[in-house]
Swiss-Prot record:
Ranges of the Cytoplasmic topological domain: 1328-1345, 1409-1427
InterPro entries: BTN3A2-like_Ig-C, Ig-like_dom, Ig-like_dom_sf, Ig-like_fold, Ig_sub, Ig_V-set, IgSF_BTN/MOG
Miscellaneous comment text of the record: Encoded by one of the 11 copies of Skint genes clustered in the D1 region of the chromosome 4.
Membrane topology: Multi-pass membrane protein
The protein's name in its UniProt record: Selection and upkeep of intraepithelial T-cells protein 5
Designated gene of the protein: Skint5
Keywords, comma-separated and alphabetical: Disulfide bond, Glycoprotein, Immunoglobulin domain, Membrane, Repeat, Signal, Transmembrane, Transmembrane helix
GO cellular component: membrane
Disulfides per UniProt: 49-123, 163-217
Length: 1461
């Protein structure tokens, strides 16, 4: 019945699967230590676990973790320790012992166990998908047997007992018990934990006076159950006083007896000491006795058996001897050595050492001791400090003595300076250990912080600190200690303000110094910042610290990376809640001064503003800080000292904050308050207001800005419109914004509705003046007349209807509203609509060609009069200027009308009575006209003519000119302005600068603008090119005054020095300088000025390397150019000469200049006159005694390389050698210079790379020098010495020394040796094979090849190589020896020889094929003769081969000579 359901095979499969599951689930188990495992605190813990059954675990994942699987204490996977995934605090404290990992056993070791290491540890093994773990509980404990009972002095009530015990973990149980073991309640209990987390327990018990007690202090650790106890037996309190009185009486009697005896001994010893002193100081006593006396004193001082009293008397004797003037310096030195050895001795006790040091100190402080003795004393101190044998306790005593000496007011400043030099050398010394240095630095710290030490001493101490920080020899640990001293001194309230100021000056100079490493600078800044954040530091000190930070930010010498790090730290301080508000206020003042400073670059300013923005946007920053930040923003926007570029950055930041969704509504409200106050403030510039209003417009129209922000923005618009203090121009801009928002299709209906409500409330309000209402209604009319119809316009119609029916609106407003809505209203009464109509008529009249010139003139006079009246409101002025702009831009208006109109504009700008704001508005319109590409060129030309006449006029105010120049600058910087317009504008600038009648102040202003423009990296290359072209024309013009040219050159120099100027702009500027120097029409005076400027650039170390490289590239071009006048070249070479002679100029610059000289002399394109002049300069430099030896050495190296060069023309070399001859002939030249020169001549003659012709020329010159009678005898002797050494030298070729030898004689010996070698090698091989009864094989033939190659190598004067080859291969080279030989020849010979050799080998192969016997071939005299003839041909045609090579390749020629040599 059971068999029906499932077949047998199915049963088998199921059973098999179940077995597999059972096997896979029981691969291994993990066993380990039993819990709990106890470990002592600060000890090492070892936890082990084992796989069961034992198996290999190297391939498994082994993970030790505590609470979380993802936070391993140790991780091992696939045979690797994964330190990157271990929890940070266990990385350096754990290790896994894997000695028995093959058996599946591992041990985790944890070092320096802390309290947090308690808990459950999981030992987790994972193999593939299978895993198992074992859990071990660990408990950290610490017990102590150190337990004490302290009994306080008894009183009438009783006695207090105090039980102490330390070094327990975890917190133990502590109690008092009586003699029966019963619990006694404690009076009080307390505990504390030290830095190692050990518990220190204290327990009090008060016992009354009328009882006899036995008390036990009992303490127990609950984890280990270890118990410790201590007992005390107490008699009655009053009974204990009787023996005390007896003891006191006995002590008094004993002391009295002792002091009487001591007094008697004292008198005797004093007499004895005086006797010793007189003996040692007496001149009658011989030296041997004195020495014996001093040695005995030293041995007694160092002896432990001599009592302290005797030692004290001896030390008094030493002190009096040192201070005595009658004792000679040698004896004093000996005494001090004995003191030093006693101090450094380990057997001398502490008391003796203290007395010795006191005697040294008193001698140093004493005014009667001479300076020589004091120097000896100080040297003794120094050697003791720096001694490694001296124990730390003695060093402490010694340093205390030094400290008291420094802080003493009676010590003179000279001695203090010597003492401080000792301290400095000890700090900077690498032999002095860190502990000693720490003690020394503590002395410095206490002296700085002490109020008793005078300011001069403190200044000396601070100089030590400064030199140690800046020194590269001082180790990092010492510098860290120094920085801690600085920080503690700054934060200390005991240190006076003058000392702190000195300290901060040191910090500042160290930060700005290039010699101080980056780590030390960061440490100094960190100490300043931590002091600022500290609540202990007073406000005056913080002010000093912040000034130091300010100078670091504004300094150009401070590295950019340090500045950015500093600014980041400032940001964290601002955002910190722990820092006080007054500190933050001071920090913001620094930021503000940095923003207003011209020395701080725009990049750092942007970074500062971003810091403030992030602080405003941060939710962690408190409201008080945010208010300070907002005030800062407001003051910077409203400040006149802040440059426009910075203000634009501020405005951009505000805009991004308003449009950001991450900024909370409260912060936005604070920012909007800034905008509102700035708009309504009359002191804020109109341009800044315009930027702020653009922010409002873009934010309202932006879809990313939330509705709450938009409502707040619109409320600002409403309050500004309704505010009577806001000027009409601002209101007009606000109304334009309203108009554009209503007409915009991107703005949602809700925003438009809100805007219309603003208009309605403003029209209905009685507080709003009639002028504002008129403007509002006018804008309403413009919206209604617009062809753009959208829901906003419909809403406006509804608004008009509601205003008409409103009872709160007065009749006049309603009347104006009705006039606007009617398109054909004609009214004679004065109202805004009439004004608009008059303006329209005025525009039509001016545009009409039928109107006569007289009528136009009347109209223009009227315009001028309206703009000049200060009572006319700004809104009307704006409208009028709009019309003027339109007239000038329209091409249909005739030029005469435009000219008249521009004449009137000029008169307005020249009139000092016209308001500056009106002029600014007018100039804004002029800028817009010039930027417009649709405006005719003729109109622009007329306009620029007027600008020129304004700038040239002396009656125009400086402010007006400044405004005008600002507009010109922005025009040139704008990329949308046409090139043609810029060219016209620059032409006018040129004419102004060339005009001698123009005031110098105007020219200065203009040139300042040019400088700012060129330094701006955003300006395009084309505009820079145009401007530099004009500068060139100004400098070349003879009509321009010298003062103007000098100012232009000053600007050029400052641009070139500036690191903010783009490299391409500098390159363009150099092009222009080069063109000026090349021009013959330019005056020589101007060229001299330019060249002086170049000299200054070269000599300055602050000038960038790239800058100098650009200048270096130009010098060869100027000198090579034939168009440049010789006079200019002379001046340039004079400058090069003076630079080379200067010691202050950098070596790198000089090296570069010498490279240029060398390249000029090596070029064939350079004119002969230029070379001659250049060589004159070289001669002058070498003849001058004031020029440094190193400089001359440099120059002579260059001369040598020129003479050795193949590319230098022979004529140039001839000229150079003429100069060398004239130097050697000159009697004024220093003998050392001549010696250097002759050394170079020797090296040239000895060199194989120098051409034969050059050597010949040089030898001719030497010959003429020796013949000359004008040459000094010393020079000739030096020259003959050099010739003698050259002739002796084996490296010199025969060609150089003996030119007349026939060519074949040189190789006669080589040829003989070659033939002899061939014969010898052949005979040896023949005899060798005969003895062995062997037949000749092919290898025998290659032995002949070996002899051939020997012949070739010897032929090339290379016997050594031949011998090496002979030794390497022996008599029988390998079977394919010809391959090695051919390769060798290819490397060291010419291809012609290879062809000859290959032909020979081929011929030999052909002969082999035709002969039966190799032996007969070997004996064939024909082959031998042919080979000899071929090699003789090669030998006697070396000259011809050399000639061929000369035409083929100069490099191969050099190689040929090298092999030959």
């Amino acid at each position: 019945m059971g068999a029906v359901g499932i077949p047998l095979t199915a049963h088998c499969v199921v059973l098999f699967l179940l077995q597999m599951v059972a096997l896979s689930s029981e691969q291994f188990t993990v066993n380990g230590l039993e819990s709990p495992v106890l470990v002592p605190l600060d000890g090492n813990l070892e936890l082990s676990c084992q796989l069961s059954p034992p198996q290999q675990a190297k391939h498994m994942e082994i993970r030790w973790f505590k609470n979380r699987y993802s936070e391993p204490v140790y991780l091992y996977r696939n045979g690797k320790d994964l330190f990157g995934e271990i929890v940070y605090k266990y990385v350096e404290r754990t290790e896994l012992l894997k000695d028995d990992i093959g058996k599946g056993k591992v041990t985790l070791r944890i070092f320096k166990v802390t309290s947090v290491d308690s808990g459950s540890y999981h030992c987790f093994f994972k193999d593939g998908k299978f895993y198992e773990e074992h859990i071990i509980d660990v408990k950290v404990t610490a017990t102590s047997s150190d337990i004490q009972i302290l009994m306080h002095p008894p009183n009438i009530k009783g006695v207090r007992l105090e039980c102490h015990s330390g070094g327990w973990f975890p917190q133990p149980h502590m109690e008092w018990r009586d003699s029966k073991g019963e619990y006694i309640p404690a009076t009080s209990k307390s505990h504390s934990q030290d830095e190692n987390e050990f518990f220190n327990m204290t327990m009090d018990l008060f016992i009354k006076s009328n009882s006899h007690w036995s008390a036990t202090c009992y303490i127990q650790n609950f984890v280990t159950h270890q118990e410790e106890s201590i007992s005390i037996v107490l008699p009655g309190v009053w009974d204990s006083w009787c023996p005390a009185w007896i003891m006191i009486t006995l002590l008094i009697v004993i002391h009295m007896t002792y002091y009487i005896k001591l007094y008697r001994t004292y008198a005797t010893k004093e007499m004895l000491l005086k006797s010793i002193q007189s003996s040692s100081q007496s001149s009658t006593v011989d030296t041997e006795k004195k020495e014996w006396l001093l040695k005995s004193i030293q041995s007694r001082i160092q002896s432990s058996s001599v009592d302290a009293e005797k030692k004290e008397w001896l030390l008094k004797f030493i002190q009096s001897s040192i201070q005595s003037s009658s004792v000679d310096l040698e004896k004093k030195e000996w005494l001090l050595k004995s003191i030093q050895s006693s101090i450094q001795s380990a057997i001398v006790d502490r008391g003796t050492k203290e007395w010795l040091l006191e005697s040294i100190q008193s001698s140093i402080l004493s005014s009667i001791v001479d300076q020589g003795t004091k120097v000896l004393l100080l040297k003794s101190i120094q050697s003791s400090i720096q001694s490694s044998t001296l124990d730390i306790e003695t060093k402490e005593l010694l340093l205390k003595s030094i400290q008291s000496s420094i802080q003493s007011s009676i010590m003179d400043l000279g001695t203090k300076e010597l003492l401080l030099k000792i301290i400095q050398s000890s700090i900077q010394s690498s032999s002095v250990d860190l502990g000693t240095k720490e003690l020394l630095l503590k002395i410095i710290q206490s002296s700085i912080q002490s109020s008793t030490v005078d300011l001069g001493t403190k200044e000396l101490l601070l100089k030590i600190i400064q030199s140690s920080i800046q020194s590269s020899s001082v180790d990092l640990g010492t510098k860290e200690l120094l920085l801690k001293i600085i920080q503690s001194s700054i934060q200390s309230s005991t240190v006076d303000l003058g000392t702190k100021e000195l300290l901060l000056k040191i910090i500042q100079s160290s930060i700005q110094s290039s010699s101080v490493d980056l780590g030390a600078k960061m440490g100094l800044l960190e100490s300043i910042l931590s002091s600022i954040q500290s609540s202990n530091v007073d406000l005056e000190t913080k002010v000093l610290l912040l000034k130091s930070i300010q100078s670091s930010i504004q300094s150009s010498t401070v590295y950019l990376g340090i500045k950015q790090w500093l600014l980041e730290r400032i940001e964290s301080i601002i955002q910190s809640s722990s820092v006080y508000l007054d500190t933050k206020e001071l920090l913001l003042k620094i930021i503000q001064s940095s923003i207003e400073s011209y020395s701080v670059d725009l990049g750092n300013k942007e970074f500062l503003l971003k810091i403030i923005l992030s602080s405003i946007q941060s939710s962690s920053v408190d409201l008080g800080t945010k208010e300070l930040l907002v005030k800062f923003f407001q003051s910077n926007i409203q400040s006149s000292s802040v440059i426009p570029g910075t203000k634009k950055l501020l405005v951009k930041i505000i805009q991004s904050s308003l449009q950001s969704s991450s900024v909370d509504l409260g912060t936005k409200k604070v920012l909007l308050d800034i905008i509102q106050t700035s708009i309504q403030n009359s002191n804020v510039h109109t341009e800044r207001k315009g930027l702020l209003l653009k922010i409002i417009q873009s934010s309202v129209q932006s879809s990313s800005v939330d509705q709450g922000t938009k409502e707040m923005l619109l409320e600002i618009i409403q309050s500004s419109i309704q505010n009577s203090s806001v000027n009409q121009w601002t209101k007009d801009l606000l109304l334009k914004i309203i108009q554009s928002i209503i007409q915009s299709s991107s703005v949602d209906l809700g925003t438009k509705g809100f805007l219309l409500k603003i208009i309605q409330s403003s029209i209905q309000s009685s507080s709003v003046d009639i002028g504002t209402k008129s403007m509002l209604l006018k804008k309403t009319g413009l919206i209604l007349k617009s062809s753009i119809v959208n829901p906003g316009t419909e809403l406006l119609f509804q608004l008009i209807e509601s205003i008409r029916h409103s009872s709160s609106v007065n009749s006049e407003t309603k009347k104006m509203l009705s006039e606007i809505t009617q398109s054909t209203v004609q009214s004679s009464s004065v109202n805004p609509v009439t004004e608009e109509m008059i303006e329209e008529k005025y525009q039509l009249l001016l545009q009409s060609s039928s109107v006569n010139l007289e009528a136009e003139n009347i109209l223009n006079v009227t315009t001028q009069w309206i703009l000049q009246i200060s009572s006319v409101n700004q809104g009307k002025e704006m409208l009028l200027l709009d019309k003027i702009q339109q007239i000038l831009q329209i091409s249909s208006v005739n030029p005469e009308t435009k000219d008249l109109l521009l004449e009137k504009i000029e008169l307005i700008l020249q009139n000092p009575g016209v308001h500056q704001e009106t002029k600014d508005l007018l100039l804004e319109r002029i800028q817009l006209i010039l930027q417009n590409s649709s405006v005719q060129k003729e109109t622009k030309y007329l306009l620029l003519e007027r600008i020129r006449s304004i700038l040239q006029s002396s009656c125009v105010q400086k402010e007006t000119k400044d405004l005008l120049l600002e507009r010109i600058q922005s025009l040139l910087q704008s990329s949308c302005v046409q090139k043609e317009t810029k060219d016209l504008l620059l032409e006018k600038i040129q004419l102004i600068l060339q005009n001698s009648t123009v005031h110098q102040e105007t020219k200065d202003l203009l040139l300042e603008r040019i400088q700012l423009f060129l330094q701006n990296s955003t300006v395009d290359q084309e505009t820079s090119y145009l401007l530099l072209k004009r500068i060139q024309l100004i400098l070349q013009s003879s009509s321009v005054k010298k003062e103007t040219k000098e100012f232009v050159l000053y600007i050029i120099e400052s641009i070139l020095h500036s690191s903010s100027v783009h490299q391409e702009t500098k390159d363009l500027l150099f092009d222009r300088v080069q063109l000026i120097l090349e021009s013959s029409s330019v005056q020589q005076g101007l060229k001299c000025l330019l060249l002086n400027m170049i000299q200054v650039i070269f000599q300055r170390t602050s000038v960038q390397k790239e800058m100098k490289d650009l200048l270096f590239n130009r010098i060869p071009l100027i000198l090579e150019s034939s168009s440049v006048q010789q006079e200019t070249k002379d001046k340039l070479l004079d400058i090069i000469q003076s630079i080379l002679q200067r010691t202050s100029v950098q070596e790198e610059t000089k090296d570069k200049l010498l490279d240029i000289i060398q390249s000029i002399l090596q070029r064939s394109s350079v004119q002969k006159d230029t070379i001659d002049t250049l060589l004159d300069r070289i001669q002058l430099i070498l003849q001058r005694t004031s020029v440094q030896k190193e400089m001359k050495d440099f120059l002579l190296d260059r001369i040598k390389s020129i003479l050795e060069s193949f590319s230098v023309h022979q004529e140039t070399k001839k000229l150079l050698l003429n100069r060398i001859m004239s130097i050697l002939e000159s009697s004024t030249v220093h003998q050392e210079t001549k010696k250097l020169l002759l050394e170079r001549i020797q090296s040239i003659l000895e060199s194989s790379s120098v051409q034969q012709e050059t050597k010949k020329l040089l030898l001719d010159r030497i010959h003429s020098i020796l013949k000359s009678s004008s040459v000094q005898k010393e020079t000739k002797n030096l020259l003959l010495d050099r010739i003698h050494s050259i002739l002796k030298s084996s490296s010199v070729q025969k060609e150089s020394c003996n030119k007349r030898n026939p060519f074949w004689k040189k190789y006669a010996l080589d040829l003989g040796i070659s033939v002899f070698t061939i014969i010898v090698v052949t005979l040896i091989m023949h005899l060798k094979q005969r003895e062995a009864d062997q037949h000749f094989e092919l290898n025998t033939l290659w032995s002949k090849d070996t002899s051939v190659i020997l012949c070739v190598l010897i032929m090339f004067n290379n016997r050594l190589k031949a011998l090496i080859y002979f030794r390497l291969y022996g008599f029988s080279p390998p079977g394919k020896a010809h391959k090695y030989i051919v390769n060798y020849i290819l490397r060291f010979s010419h291809p012609v020889f290879c062809i000859v050799y290959s032909a020979t080998i081929l011929y030999m192969y052909l002969q082999i094929q035709n002969k039966d016997s190799l032996f007969s071939l070997y004996n064939s005299w024909m082959v031998e003769m042919e080979m000899v003839l071929i090699f003789l041909l090669v030998i006697f045609n070396v000259k011809n081969i050399a000639t061929v090579l000369l035409y083929f390749d100069s490099t191969t020629l050099r190689l040929f000579f090298w092999i030959k040599g």
